[in-house]
Regions:
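Conserved active-site beta-strand element of glycosyltransferases/polysaccharide synthases
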Residues: 224-228, 234-237
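Short acidic/polar active-site loop segments enriched in Thr and Asp
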Residues: 25, 71, 118
Length: 253
């Protein structure tokens, strides 16, 4: 493995032949959930298909990935799945159906696409990126993060002096929190798939977000932190969250 400074230099000089093993292969957008906290809108329209600032949420994310050069995009759907099918023709994405979206959490969505996990972006349909954060070459696996002052009930990241995540706590003060997309490199994906394949059918892991498997296996699953400015990554958990950003949201949906 080359050093990070060598990676950055090769990237600046556009020496892409030397960076083949660092090229992003694909992306997965997780869009299967019920979005219960997005009621009443989600009763008739999944969160990812709502219009924010004039753009359909999932379409904006697909465009950003494609503009970065990532052409192989998997969209995992479940709740009102048929409403997402048009994306296949419009954007040439691959639709994966999660028919257990109402009994299992998003770890099942990753289980359905585990064969294609390699150098892979893992994206959530409820994020909105002010600027395009994606790129075609990445040095190492990471979890995106923003810094929050004061108390937060989000997942708080602790790192060593190299930026590698050492522990994750739910809730904290003045902390870097998990927020936004994740990048799995091939090493991480290999370990993650091995752990995924060993989960028993009756395990509680199937009823948790995939990050629980990650934080319980930090000795095997290594990701760095990737810090972003707080105003550049938005997460829409509720209708009120969107209205704060887009005053016309209810009128347009």
């Amino acid at each position: 493995m080359i050093t990070r400074s060598d990676f950055d230099k090769l990237l600046r000089n556009q020496q892409y032949e030397e960076l083949k093993s660092y090229k992003v292969e694909n992306a997965v957008i997780l869009a299967a959930g019920l979005s219960k906290r997005f009621l009443p809108i989600s009763e008739y329209c999944p969160k990812g298909l709502t219009k924010v600032k004039g753009e359909i949420l999932i379409e904006r994310q697909i465009r950003q990935l494609q503009e970065a050069g990532i052409k192989e995009i998997y969209v995992v759907v479940g709740y009102k799945k048929e409403l997402f099918f048009y994306l296949k023709d419009k954007f040439n994405v691959i639709i994966v159906e999660n028919n257990e979206y109402d009994t299992k959490d998003n770890i099942e969505s990753l289980n359905l696409v585990k064969k294609i996990l390699g150098n892979t972006y893992i994206c959530s349909v409820d994020n909105y990126y002010i600027d395009n954060p994606f790129r075609l070459y990445e040095y190492k696996g990471y979890y995106s993060s923003i810094y929050v002052e004061g108390y937060t009930d989000e997942w708080c990241i602790n790192t060593d002096n190299t930026g590698t995540i050492q522990s994750v706590n739910i809730g904290g003060h003045d902390a870097d929190i998990m927020m936004g997309y994740v990048y799995f490199d091939r090493v991480f994906s290999k370990q993650f798939k091995a752990l995924l394949s060993k989960i028993p059918d009756d395990s509680e892991y199937w009823h948790q977000v995939w990050e629980y498997l990650y934080i319980h296996n930090l000795d095997k699953l290594h990701l760095e932190i990737k810090r972003h400015e707080p105003e550049l990554i938005l997460e829409f958990d509720s209708v009120n969250d969107v209205i704060k950003f887009d005053k016309s949201f209810l009128k347009n949906n």
